[in-house]
Design a protein with these regions (language model features):
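Conserved ABC ATPase signature
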Residues: 136-140, 144
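Helix-to-loop junction immediately C-terminal to a conserved catalytic motif
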Residues: 51
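A short, proline-enriched helix->beta-strand linker immediately N-terminal to the Walker B motif
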Residues: 155-159
Length: 348
């Protein structure tokens, strides 16, 4: 559906800036695709290259089989009708009602009043604004304003919806409702949605795949589940850790003395990660039953990512050192990830 091939963007001037550096991505039809990065990472420039609001310095932008970089100005205007966009700050016309804001792009396209009404009435119903059609932006909450922006973007019946930090100006509860709306639109209309954000929680909630961008370069890309369960780059680990932490809380670390070596009187401190059906594995019970170990659980939790359960445990394997080693060997035979963090004082 969307293919970016070797996209680069350079802003020339006294302070030359390489905003994007040789980026290649493929976004399949019907996906919700997230691009995450900190301020200045290049994510806004990248998403604006998809609809050519920013023309790349080099590379190809192929949307639904058409390379937008090769189109004339008039051809590009036609192609953009199939690419909707919503913005962080809504960009509504204060002098127009909800209905007239949504109708505005269709008026520019020359549709009749009857055609416009037929087009946008069901859209206003989908976004939950049927009872607000005569309200002005000043009479709306932030979430309602964003719903107007979404309705306006959908009015042209796009195949692609671009979301430029669409929830970053909203409170958490409103953000949740907007994300639910985007999921509903994706499922109901089969829209391909590309969103940029600096919030990993947004990625976790609705995205099928995610790309992590930093300094104009894609650091890491994969399914949301893959990236959450196995982040490779430090930046990605920081993003994931802001939402799902599998590290021992600082409060707990302050009460234990961690050793690098397994010395007398210490026991292994082990991090365990389970995905999918592996969360049903009775690991702790197995260690107690098979090896007569006293397993102390210091930290644990289960999250759900892309409808898949992801569990985490940090445990101490107290007991006879030989039995503890056998327990570690046993853990490594299971369909779970494990890591010995270090060694702590064993309980008596």
């Amino acid at each position: 559906m969307i293919t970016l091939e070797h996209i680069s963007k350079v802003y020339e001037g006294a302070n030359r800036v390489e905003a994007l550096k040789d980026i290649s991505l493929t976004i399949e039809k019907g996906q919700i695709y997230g691009i995450i990065g900190q301020s200045g990472a290049g994510k806004s420039t990248l998403i604006r290259c998809i609809n050519m609001l920013e023309a790349p310095t080099s590379g190809s932008v192929i949307v639904d089989g058409t390379d937008l970089t090769k189109l004339s100005a008039s051809e590009l205007r036609k192609a953009r009708k199939h690419i909707g966009m919503i913005f962080q700050h809504f960009n509504l016309l204060s002098s127009r009602t909800v209905y007239d804001n949504v109708a505005f792009p269709l008026e520019l396209q020359g549709l009749s009043k009857a055609e416009i009404k037929e087009r946008i009435t069901p859209i206003l119903d989908i976004v939950g604004l049927s009872d607000r059609v005569n309200n002005y932006p000043s009479q709306l909450s932030g979430g309602q304003k964003q719903r107007v922006g979404i309705a306006r973007a959908l009015a042209s019946h796009p195949k692609v919806l671009l979301c430029d930090e669409a929830t970053s100006a909203l409170d958490p509860q409103t953000t949740e409702s907007i994300l639910e709306l985007l999921k509903d639109i994706n499922e109901r209309m089969g829209l391909t949605i590309v969103l940029i954000t600096h919030e990993m929680q947004v990625i976790r909630e609705i995205c099928d795949r995610v790309a992590v961008i930093e300094g104009g370069v894609i650091l890491e890309e994969g399914s949301t589940l893959e990236v959450f369960t196995n982040p490779k780059k430090p930046t990605t680990k920081d993003f994931v850790g802001s939402v799902v932490s599998d590290n021992l809380p600082q409060e707990a670390l302050e009460h234990i003395e961690l050793h690098d070596d397994w010395i007398a009187g210490t026991a292994p401190l082990v991090k365990l990660k389970f995905t999918g059906q592996a969360t049903d594995e009775p690991v702790v019970a197995g260690l107690v039953r098979r090896f007569d170990l006293d397993v102390s659980i210091l930290f644990g939790g289960i999250d759900y990512i892309q409808n898949t359960s992801v569990g985490r445990l940090i445990v101490i394997l107290n007991g006879d050192p030989m039995k503890a080693q056998e327990g570690l060997d046993y853990i490594r035979t299971l369909p779970i990830e494990s890591e010995v963090i270090g060694y702590v004082r064993a309980s008596n």
